[in-house]
Curated annotation (Swiss-Prot):
EC number(s) given by UniProt: 6.1.1.19
Manganese recorded as keyword: no
Localization, UniProt: Cytoplasm
GO cellular component: cytoplasm
Reactions performed catalytically: tRNA(Arg) + L-arginine + ATP = L-arginyl-tRNA(Arg) + AMP + diphosphate
This protein's name: Arginine--tRNA ligase
Subunit structure: Monomer.
Organism: Parabacteroides distasonis (strain ATCC 8503 / DSM 20701 / CIP 104284 / JCM 5825 / NCTC 11152)
Record PROSITE patterns: AA_TRNA_LIGASE_I (PS00178)
GO biological process, one term: arginyl-tRNA aminoacylation
Cross-referenced InterPro entries: aa-tRNA-synth_I_CS, Arg-tRNA-ligase, Arg-tRNA-synth_N, Arg-tRNA-synth_N_sf, ArgRS_core, DALR_anticod-bd, Rossmann-like_a/b/a_fold, tRNAsynth_Ia_anticodon-bd
Family that this chain belongs to: Belongs to the class-I aminoacyl-tRNA synthetase family.
Chain span(s) of sequence motif 'HIGH' region: 125-135
Gene name of the encoded protein: argS
Regions that span the bilayer: none
Lineage, uppermost ranks: Bacteria, Pseudomonadati, Bacteroidota, Bacteroidia, Bacteroidales
Length: 597
């Protein structure tokens, strides 16, 4: 904050004048004063005792008196033991608000052509089923993180790797071929991803029937699966796909295209997008090539059965399979290939993978392998590891068809938001189109905020009922406060009030108003911290705290009814800047805020 920098400079000058010692800004420990004490900023004086050769209280007293004489930003001070509590002058807070008011994008660092380029991968769906609740957390985290990293002055490429090949895809294809009767999204009235997901579940159920029948004849579960004709057919279909069989490839393309159309609808409703999409079917051969290159260079080794491995024991890990004995690739091989293609396509300075914490070991290994293969970005890749998400009813499974689909969840959230908003009268005097738009904004905002306010590294339970509440740490509470501020500003405009670009520095404001200005000013640091920690939760919880503080201010003070015109203008400018920061912060979370509600 500018005020802190100003006072820090004065403290450095004071230490020099009082004690003849040179100190740096990093040695000046200036922090927010605790709520139980009077003041805005507190200086810890203990580091200066060896220079002053006096008691903590006397040293604090001398520095306080120096600041009072020489720094206009300091209005008064008090000393508690070794702590110097400073009260900042009213005029400084108003001046700080003027400065923030001049900056439409306060707290956001502009991106230039010279800015570092960060690629962030998220979503990574399989084309055998719709996106589910786990994907929702992944997409929301990835999209928000891309906005936060961009707000920290980086160029961003949002990317997605679609897992469009493999045995799981062949299971859906085989089920459609055997029992689909030519079903299409058009003939069934279903989204393509849901239709294909149904066939994946159907295959799983048919496989269970077959293996249970074999187990009834005395076979073990493992023996039954090994003798399954369905699994044999699925493996044969995969072999044909890899061999480029025209019929299998045509079926694969048709069914995948149905899925992509469905995914696009889901992404659009969720409000996330991508700059570049990669497909595993295009990258796995690249990975094989890099592995063979590593084998030739002696980085990897081949076992007697023909499989290729990396020995990572010297790196504190184990041995890692890279190519099976039959020459087929594993996930690690594909990730190596995808990384190569990406760095061929873009001059990437940093690569971030948004993938659940069950893959921690995988990315630890990938980082080492890429480094061994000579990729400069290997050591610096970031695995943004996040926890699992569940509903109150328990975990999600996709094979049994009990998965919580993202589409169903979003539709339910919008429907619930519509009902609650109607009950509370928040849709009164709106056209049906406006009311539906508010239901969408509130429903999706509830979902996004509830997920993003949680520390991403923690497992969480998503509670739909809790998330749609117009009170407490929720999206609707923040959205409603924003709409309330916009309503105040509209009424001011209707009364002919034109907000000044610069407020005079000559009037007194309350402590609560000073606190609000301080909170607004903190936004720039919050954005930096969120980028540093890869945590949208930093932004979410800051916005909630800001809105909570504003609501208390709104309750305690008159705005439009204030008789003093200077104070009225000040409170309107203060309100406008709270709204500006709320909108900016919610945008970093990918959440819309309504102008009226």
């Amino acid at each position: 904050m500018v005020i802190e920098q100003q006072i820090t400079g004065a403290i450095i000058a004071g230490i020099k004048e009082l004690y003849g010692a040179d100190v740096t800004a990093s040695q000046v420990q200036l922090q927010k004063t605790k709520k139980e004490f009077k003041g805005h900023l507190t200086l810890v004086v203990f580091p200066f005792l060896r220079m002053s050769k006096k008691s903590p209280e006397q040293t604090a007293q001398e520095i306080g008196e120096y600041l009072l004489r020489n720094e206009p930003a300091v209005a008064e001070f008090n000393v508690i033991k070794g702590f110097l509590n400073l009260t900042v002058a009213c005029s400084c807070w108003i001046d700080l608000l003027n400065s923030i008011n001049e900056q439409p994008a306060y707290g956001i660092i502009p991106v230039t052509e010279q800015s570092p380029l960060v690629m962030i991968e998220y979503s990574s769906p399989n084309t055998n089923k719709p996106l589910h609740l786990g994907h929702v957390r992944n997409n929301l985290l990835g999209y928000s993180l891309s906005k936060i990293i961009k707000a920290n002055g980086n160029q961003i490429v949002k990317t997605n790797i679609v897992n469009d090949r493999g045995i799981h895809i062949c299971k859906s294809m085989l089920a459609w071929q055997k029992w689909g009767n030519g079903a299409t999204p058009e003939s069934t009235g279903k989204k393509g991803d849901h239709l294909i997901g149904d066939f994946y579940v159907l295959f799983s159920n048919k496989l269970k029937e077959e293996t249970h029948a074999l187990e009834a004849k005395g076979l073990t579960k493992e023996e039954a699966e090994a003798q399954s004709t369905l699994m044999a057919e699925a493996r044969e279909m995969l072999r044909k796909w890899e061999a480029g069989d025209k019929e299998v490839r045509a079926l694969w393309e048709m069914m995948n295209n149905w899925v992509y159309a469905g995914f696009n609808e889901t992404y659009k409703m969720m409000g996330v997008d991508f700059d570049k999409i990669y497909y595993e079917s295009q990258t796995y051969l690249e990975g094989k090539g890099k592995v063979m290159e590593g084998l030739e260079k002696g980085i990897f080794y081949r076992r007697e059965d023909g499989s290729v491995w990396a020995d990572l024991t010297k790196d504190g890990l184990d041995e890692k399979l890279l190519l099976r004995a039959d020459g087929t690739s594993v996930y690690m091989t594909q990730d190596i290939g995808t990384a190569k293609l990406r760095f061929d396509d873009y001059p990437i300075n940093k690569m971030i993978y948004v993938v659940g914490n069950e893959q921690n070991y995988h990315f630890q290994v990938l980082s080492i392998l890429l480094d061994k293969l000579g990729f400069e970005f290997g050591k610096g890749l970031v695995h943004f590891s996040y926890g699992m998400v569940e509903l109150p009813e328990g975990k999600m499974k996709s094979r049994e068809g009990t998965v919580v689909d993202a589409d169903d969840l979003m539709a339910e959230m919008i429907s619930t938001a519509r009902e609650i908003s109607q009950e509370l009268g928040k849709l009164d005097e709106m056209t049906p189109e406006e009311a539906e738009n508010i239901a969408r904004i509130v429903g999706l905002g509830s979902l996004k905020y509830f997920i993003l306010k949680v520390d991403p590294r923690k497992n969480m339970t998503f509670n739909p009922k809790e998330s749609i509440d117009f009170n407490g740490n929720t999206g609707p509470f923040i959205q409603y406060t924003y709409a309330r501020i916009r309503s105040v500003l509209r009424k001011a405009a209707e009364q002919g009030i034109v907000l000044p670009e610069q407020l005079p520095l000559t009037f007194a404001i309350s402590e609560k108003e000073e606190n609000l200005i301080q909170m607004i000013a903190d936004y720039a640091e919050i954005v930096k911290e969120a980028g540093k920690l890869y945590s949208p939760a930093c932004v979410a919880n800051y916005i909630y705290d800001l809105v909570k503080e504003y609501n208390q201010f709104y309750h305690d003070f008159s705005i439009l009814r204030e008789e003093n015109p200077e104070l009225k203008n000040f409170r309107l400018v203060l309100s406008a800047n709270v709204a500006k920061i709320v909108k900016s912060g919610m945008d970093l979370l990918g959440i819309e805020v309504p102008e009226r509600m």
